[in-house]
């Protein structure tokens, strides 16, 4: 278990650069754990944080900004509390991950549903981390 100081979500853990976002969506692998669609990319290039993430909620699904922001807040909170499930594996194997979470539900999910989906998705990504650094990236 990590120390309580690592339960924050710093700027280095947020995915915000256009080039990195395009790389994740262009070269990443995707799967769905309802209500989340997860796109991730593993690489050996050095970063400030072992995993960085972004959250996207479509305006088509939630018309009101208040609801979109609430869903994004729920996903960020679930990630913040459960990121140790993935970061421990990434740190041990010296691999870096960029992850995009997109909400595919049309209804406002509760925190318990989002947290279960987040745990399943982080465990699934951790299971796909190779045992040694990637050669071609």
Swiss-Prot record:
It is an enzyme of class 3 (hydrolase). Transmembrane segments: none annotated. It comes from the Bacteria. GO terms for molecular function: 3'-tRNA processing endoribonuclease activity; ribonuclease P activity; tRNA binding. It catalyses: Endonucleolytic cleavage of RNA, removing 5'-extranucleotides from tRNA precursor. Disulfide bonds: none annotated. InterPro entries: Ribosomal_Su5_D2-typ_SF, Ribsml_uS5_D2-typ_fold_subgr, RNase_P, RNase_P_CS. RNaseP catalyzes the removal of the 5'-leader sequence from pre-tRNA to produce the mature 5'-terminus. It can also cleave other RNA substrates such as 4.5S RNA. The protein component plays an auxiliary but essential role in vivo by binding to the 5'-leader sequence and broadening the substrate specificity of the ribozyme. HAMAP family: RNase_P. Consists of a catalytic RNA component (M1 or rnpB) and a protein subunit. This is Ribonuclease P protein component. The lineage of its organism: Bacteria, Pseudomonadati, Bacteroidota, Bacteroidia, Bacteroidales.
